[in-house]
Design a protein with these regions (language model features):
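Conserved phosphate-binding elements of NTP-dependent enzyme cores
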Residues: 1-942
Length: 942
């Protein structure tokens, strides 16, 4: 067996026909500047080829459903293993996905609660026991005399298939009718069923009229139904349109409530047998939120204080104004009074209506004038009714601006039916258990006392649950709960969850490719992650990790530095070897930082700010413990703390959402806090994250930064364009006129290939240039619009040197290190770090007011140390212009250059949410209670 993976002639994206040898069964780290070609080699070449070879081993029928990957642009790869990619882009946004379901721990928990759970009555809480035939008969016989009852035997419950054998058996048993999915059929007819849908089938055993002389017949029917269905009896009362399910398995004597024998699917919130019927297993419902109807209570009704659709007009002839005036007349208030100052009962009436009390409405329209008398339903009730009744997607979207997710009123966020939540193990129901942090769940399982019989049943289940929980703990996720929605996880958290799942699978001989697993991880937990990676390697696997973290690089068995620059300046193997060998390589920028020849300097002076501050009072969102925080304005503040210490809750949920509502007038529900003081010193808040700058290939750096508008205007001002009568719109590939209509301005045509992957071919008409022939005949300095879009930022800067407006925008893109990016490069091909730097460049090109607060959540994601140095320069420029920069960060290079630090903790989850330290980095390094301070001290001293 080969001891190396040998790659020859890799040319994917910007790779320059490189040859690489990667040792097998080793921890291999690939590093290099953002855009240097690391991901092109690791994911687009090695992983893509591993996946493609696996797909080729399948039948063409299977490939039709799975899709197939293109062969990467590489001459050969030898020594490949089956490849598994663990990246950050596959976080599930499905509201039904939780940490428990993603890790499959919840499947084991469902089995545990079904096998050893103790059922209780959901009404009285009494432990439930099985029902006998006599008890079932007595309850049916207690119905009003002359009631008609059908006794049914549920033989198939929510199972796919045609079930013809069930019908044949029923015919042979002498039965005449069955009920299928709620409809009665005669067994003499053919009953066709869709085998791909789930069906419910009940055999009609007897039809009984409740009378004293029918007890014998009723008993026989119940016994037969129970025997047919394995203990279940369904009493259908057609006149009352209701059914009663009885079980010889479990029932409450006092309340008469029956439940089926416990099965794992009853504990699934994704199954109709377990899901709360009110919210369908989501745990939340979209409800009209009064805070989004009246986002600013300091405004009056006439000042536009009510922003809800249909109620935001205060024109004299509007229906809403007619209602407001009638309400003001009846309840004696002024429409110019701030809504927050109105009496409590008036605000209640505005939102929830007058009940049966009528208003006197005066109308005056083109059709005439008059008086109406009618009650007022209230803005909240009106919006909820319109939301339920409308068929318009646009109206639904408009009304959702006033809605917020609230806990389901019935299950209170637990997602399951009441009878399922009444089943306990060790005194906890399954929802209560999954709401515990992982550390507490492990402690609960260790102290769980079961009977000898139950302990034997649960032994193997508990072993699996424990090992998976311990894996999550080993990758630094001990603060998470299994009930946590997967959609709320950061990229780093979701990646480490999948990493823990892979360790649990104990596979050997696999090639794992990971994308920055250290993201979002505090230095304190880094060693745990490295131990996990080593464990995965020691099982006999090869790990290729794309990473910039210095600790991970030093822990590698083999380090590959791709570069030397980014984009067209990268794509080569600068150096490959042990970390010590790379550190000695003069040509390697990574090596220079590893050896200490290059470093990011600590600033000689810290900014002290403009004397003003934002003060957050009583922040209590998620795990925050009613903390008060002061954020100085005019400086760069770094919010730090271990993973799960509530950094994002404080900055993104409380601060950002409150300020974006007040300053940018956005409709969002902010996190819980008593208030924020000092907002008057700011005029806007901007969140610069790593989300894509566009979702389609039509979006590119030129369109996002506004550069393309200036370039189109320049082309429209040329002599060629004026002679032809072309305006700036002629040079857009998004509208008819100048674009190529054969490909609608895409430059590519998609050819569907059925069981082969879709093929994208250049448009035969425009040859991929996006524009029609006439548009491409217009030139500026000898170049047409398509040729300009194909330029890199660096080339364009030289080309447009005499156009100050365009030159300045291009210069900011150069300043943020994006000289290698093409102006027309589709936004879908940009990395998160590149997208973020384009946003930063756009902000740098704007005229600063000095009153803006910029929020960045882990901006160093995907950035090499050299890129981090450039990022720090940009943040310094924004701060030096008088603005405030607030950064959530674990990267010590950023933390050490901050003017002010807010350290949260001390731990993650419930043990976090407190302010551990505030002050300068030097003072933080001296704080013994701060984990950040301990690592910062080493960084400042180095």
């Amino acid at each position: 067996m080969r001891d190396h993976i040998v790659i020859k002639g890799a040319r994917e994206n910007n790779l320059k026909n490189i040859d690489v040898e990667i040792p097998r069964d080793a921890l291999v780290v690939m590093t290099g500047l953002s855009g240097s070609g690391k991901s092109s080699l690791a994911f687009d070449t090695i992983f893509a080829e591993g996946q493609r070879r696996y797909m080729e081993s399948l039948s063409s029928y299977a490939r039709q459903f799975l899709g197939q990957m293109d062969k990467p642009d590489v001459d050969s790869i030898e020594g490949m293993s089956p490849a598994i990619s663990i990246d950050q882009k596959t976080t599930s946004k499905n509201p039904r996905s939780t940490v428990g379901t993603v890790t499959e721990i919840y499947d084991y928990l469902r089995l545990l609660w079904a096998r050893v759970g103790v059922p209780h009555c959901p009404k009285c809480g009494k432990e439930i026991r099985r029902q006998t035939v006599d008890q079932i008969v007595d309850q049916i016989a207690a119905l009003p005399q002359a009631t008609r009852v059908q006794i049914l035997a549920p033989v198939v419950r929510a199972r796919k298939g045609e079930h013809q054998k069930v019908f044949d058996d029923a015919r042979r048993g002498g039965y005449v009718r069955v009920r299928v999915d709620g409809s009665i059929y005669d067994l003499t007819e053919v009953i066709p069923l869709d085998k791909n849908r789930k069906h419910n089938i009940e055999i009609v055993v007897d039809r009984v009229v409740i009378r004293p002389d029918q007890n014998r017949r009723l008993t026989d029917a119940v016994e037969i139904a129970s025997a047919l269905s394995g203990g279940l009896v369904l009493a259908d009362i057609p006149e009352e349109k209701r059914e009663i399910l009885f079980s010889q398995n479990y029932a409450c004597d006092d309340c008469g409530i029956s439940i089926e024998e416990l099965t794992p699917r009853m504990f699934s919130f994704n199954s109709p047998y377990g899901a709360c019927p009110t919210c369908g297993g989501l745990g939340t419902r979209l409800r009209i939120d009064p805070a989004l109807i009246i986002p600013d209570p300091s405004k009056s009704i006439l000042d536009g204080g009510i922003t809800a659709s249909g109620w935001n007009s205060v024109k004299g002839d509007s229906i809403s104004r007619m209602y407001y005036e009638a309400l003001a007349e009846k309840y004696h208030f002024d429409l110019t009074t701030p809504i927050g100052d109105l009496p409590e009962n008036v605000r209640e009436i505005l939102l929830y209506g007058t009940g049966d009390e009528e208003l006197t409405l005066h109308y005056d329209t083109n059709r005439g004038a008059g008086v109406l008398r009618r009650p007022f339903e209230g803005i909240v009730c009106n919006l909820e009714r319109r939301y339920q009744e409308t068929q318009s997607d646009a109206m639904r979207a408009s009304l959702e601006d006033c809605m917020a997710e609230t806990a389901c009123p019935d299950c209170r966020g637990a997602r399951l039916r009441p009878e399922v939540l009444a089943v306990t193990v060790g005194g906890l129901n399954i929802s209560e258990f999954t709401a515990l942090p992982i550390t507490e769940e492990l402690a609960f399982l260790d102290s769980l006392e079961l009977s000898e019989k139950d302990a034997k049943i649960a032994d193997s289940i508990l072993r699996e649950v424990r090992s998976r929980l311990q894996f999550l703990q080993s990758v630094g996720l001990q603060y998470l709960t299994l009930a946590r929605s997967a959609a709320t996880l950061s990229g780093g958290e979701s990646q480490r969850i999948r990493l823990a799942t892979q360790i649990g699978s104990s596979l050997m001989g696999v090639l794992y490719i990971l994308d920055e697993p250290s993201i979002g991880l505090h230095q304190r937990d880094n060693e745990k992650l490295l131990a996990t990676l080593r464990e995965l390697r020691d099982l006999g696997n090869t790990l290729i990790v794309v990473e910039h973290d210095e600790d991970t690089m030093r822990a590698a068995d083999y380090l590959i530095d791709i570069g030397p620059g980014a984009g067209v300046h990268g794509g080569e193997v600068v150096c490959a070897g042990t970390p010590e060998e790379v550190a000695r390589c003069e040509r390697s920028i990574t090596g220079q930082y590893l050896s200490g020849k290059k470093k990011i300097p600590v600033p000689a002076h810290r900014r002290t700010g403009n004397g003003h501050a934002l003060v957050i009072r009583g922040a209590a969102e998620h795990n925050l413990k009613h903390v008060d925080v002061e954020i100085p304005l005019g400086v760069m503040t770094c919010v730090t703390g271990v993973s799960g210490s509530s950094k994002s809750s404080l900055v993104n949920e409380v601060l950002y959402k409150t300020l974006v509502g007040k300053l940018n007038h956005a409709k969002v529900r902010p996190g819980k806090c008593d208030g924020i003081d000092g907002v008057e010193y700011l005029d806007k808040i901007i969140n610069i994250d790593q989300s894509p700058i566009g979702r389609t290939p039509r979006s590119n750096p030129a369109t996002y930064t506004g550069l393309f508008d200036d370039i189109r205007a320049l082309f429209a001002s040329t002599q060629d364009a004026k002679l032809r009568g072309y305006g700036a719109g002629r040079f857009s590939f998004n509208i008819r006129g100048g674009r190529c209509e054969a490909c609608s301005g895409d430059g590519l045509l998609k050819i569907e290939m059925n069981f082969l992957p879709d093929v994208y071919v250049p448009c035969e008409v425009c040859k991929g240039k996006r524009y029609n022939r006439e548009t491409l005949e217009v030139h500026y300095k000898g170049r047409n619009i398509a040729e300009v879009l194909d330029m890199t930022v660096e080339e364009a800067l030289a080309f447009f040197q005499n156009q100050p407006k365009i030159r300045d925008r291009l210069q900011t893109l150069m300043d943020v290190g994006l000289g290698y990016v093409k102006l027309g490069q589709p936004s879908t091909t940009l990395s998160g770090g590149e997208a973020q730097r384009i946003k930063l460049a756009t902000e740098l090109s704007k005229r600063s007011t000095g009153r803006t607060i910029y929020v960045l959540d882990e901006p160093t994601t995907g950035l090499h140390v050299a890129d981090v140095a450039r990022l720090i320069d940009i943040l310094d420029r924004l701060t030096d212009a008088g603005n405030t920069v607030l950064v959530i960060e674990h990267n010590l290079h950023v933390i050490k250059v901050a003017d002010h630090i807010i350290d949260l903790g001390p731990e993650g989850g419930d043990a976090g949410g407190n302010i551990v330290f505030t002050g300068t980095p030097e003072d933080c390094a001296r704080c013994t209670e701060s984990y950040t301070g301990k690592f910062l001290k080493k960084e400042l001293e180095s």
